[in-house]
Amino acid sequence: IIPEGVYIEVVVEGWGLPGSLETSEGTRTGFITVSKVTDKEKIKEFSEKYKVSAVNAEVIQLAKELNAQIVLANEEEVREAAQEAGFQVKGCLGILVDSVKNKILSPRQVIQDIDNLVASGYRIGDDIINGLKETLRRWSE
């Protein structure tokens, strides 16, 4: 489930950028649901309180309205805000690791996905990437 603001930012305004086609296809097939925040005033409050963009505040507010336990976020300030708001936070790498643990993807597939993320501009420290890849290699033995 993603808030309407994320859909607009990623698909409408960001068409052609990484993730736009996948998000569009996910909503078309029903894998991703777009949902509206009911209390729009809270978006402004969260944005000011946590010093995040309105779209990122919308993610946190929608999670609250849906009584979610986990928020998907990669940006550090959004992760911190979501944690402060009481949510467990997962990023792209955490989702990929979970996919191996749940036997959805193989460690080799996830290593390739990590390489693809980095090649497409995903920014994360080399030490984290290298450590994760080493762990995945051990899991594939």
Which residue stretches match the model-derived regions?
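Short Asp/Glu-rich motifs
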Residues: V12, A82-Q83, K101-N102, A119
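Short secondary-structure capping/turn micro-motifs that flank functional sites
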Residues: V78-E80, D98-S99, N116, K133
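Acidic/polar active-site rim loop that often engages polyanionic ligands
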Residues: E4-V6, C92-I95, Q109-D115
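Long, charged alpha-helical interface segments
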Residues: L105-E141
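A residue-level structural signature of the nucleotidyltransferase/glycosyltransferase Rossmann-like core
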Residues: I70-V71, G121
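Active-site-proximal, substrate-binding regions of enzyme catalytic domains
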Residues: I1-Q69, E76, Q83, F87, ...
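Short, ordered loop/turn segments at secondary-structure junctions
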Residues: E76-E77, G94
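Short alpha-helix plus adjacent loop in nuclease-associated cores
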Residues: L93-K103
